[in-house]
């Protein structure tokens, strides 16, 4: 394997997702970020927008029209923007990683149903690998088009996948509720992100019809009815998802444990969290700030056969930029953990 670093250009680097990819890439042993674009922050030092990167880079933002070629193009644009300009970006780099939802879905009709308009480049759908190494590691090897998985979808998919893959859930509705940090809404200000409206608030913002439902339905084995509800929380980072599902008669904790161990036993970023005592018995997104881990827990109701699954991630890392880096590592044949070694903080 060559030790020469791959050059990276980040398009839309002033937002939270692009900034998080930049943070991780600056510490990556095989990546060299050479360009970061932003229309609103052009000519400003990157550290003016991302103050946590002071002293880590001397890069300045440039306009996308000034984008030069790079080995890897990372698109951190608003949804529906990358698809409209994809041929422009394909001319700039061999490998493209998209952090938006533009290329995650394979079916243009499903895209239109969930996003409310026809896909701008339907011929592209199906050409991109869904950026979830836990499910698509082999597909990602050598991939040049990676569509990063959605954050809420990631928390749902990773919790459910082992049980569905092994046929371990009864054929009943699956209900997932996600408590989501404010950074998932992006860096642009809105009425709902205004401090007097958001601070201290727990607000249901998508009780039905969440767009990430389509991703989860596409990626998970089987065709169970799946229902997602999203609730905004006062936290900045993190998603804590609880999922109500049902196991076959006679199943116990040990059976659920065995399913997770069988599927995730060798996964570098999946941790099963189920401790008998203490305040950290189950997954907690506070402990995952800045990390690429997905912590998964569960509890059985033996009287009803209901199993409550819990998953926690940092929405900007495992839910976006970290998952993208992990996918890129697999695609390039690097150590899957490269650039993703941060273990989190406690207390925070």
UniProtKB/Swiss-Prot annotation:
Main localisation: cytoplasm
Gene of this entry: lysY
InterPro entries per record: AGPR_AS, AGPR_type-1, LysY, NAD(P)-bd_dom_sf, NAGSA_dehydrogenase, Semialdehyde_DH_NAD-bd
PANTHER family tied to this protein: [LYSW]-L-2-AMINOADIPATE_[LYSW]-L-GLUTAMATE PHOSPHATE REDUCTASE-RELATED, N-ACETYL-GAMMA-GLUTAMYL-PHOSPHATE REDUCTASE, CHLOROPLASTIC-RELATED-RELATED
Subcellular location: Cytoplasm
GO biological process: L-arginine biosynthetic process; lysine biosynthetic process via aminoadipic acid
Keyword terms, alphabetized: Amino-acid biosynthesis, Cytoplasm, Lysine biosynthesis, NADP, Oxidoreductase
EC number: 1.2.1.103
Signal peptide from the UniProt entry: none
GO terms of molecular function: N-acetyl-gamma-aminoadipyl-phosphate reductase activity; N-acetyl-gamma-glutamyl-phosphate reductase activity; NAD binding; NADP+ binding
Name of the protein: [LysW]-L-2-aminoadipate 6-phosphate reductase
GO cellular component, one term: cytoplasm
Location of the active site: 151
SUPFAM superfamilies recorded: Glyceraldehyde-3-phosphate dehydrogenase-like, C-terminal domain, NAD(P)-binding Rossmann-fold domains
Family, similarity comment: Belongs to the NAGSA dehydrogenase family. Type 1 subfamily. LysY sub-subfamily.
Matches recorded under CDD domains: AGPR_1_C_LysY, AGPR_1_N_LysY
Transmembrane helix listed as a keyword: no
Top-level taxon in the UniProt lineage: Bacteria
Organism: Deinococcus radiodurans (strain ATCC 13939 / DSM 20539 / JCM 16871 / CCUG 27074 / LMG 4051 / NBRC 15346 / NCIMB 9279 / VKM B-1422 / R1)
The keyword NADP is assigned to this record: yes
Residues that hold NADP(+) according to the record: 14-17, 315
Reactions mediated catalytically: [amino-group carrier protein]-C-terminal-N-(1-carboxy-5-oxopentan-1-yl)-L-glutamine + phosphate + NADP(+) = [amino-group carrier protein]-C-terminal-N-(1-carboxy-5-phosphooxy-5-oxopentan-1-yl)-L-glutamine + NADPH + H(+)
Record pathway: Amino-acid biosynthesis; L-lysine biosynthesis via AAA pathway; L-lysine from L-alpha-aminoadipate (Thermus route): step 3/5
Functional description taken from the UniProt entry: Catalyzes the NADPH-dependent reduction of [LysW]-aminoadipate 6-phosphate to yield [LysW]-aminoadipate 6-semialdehyde.
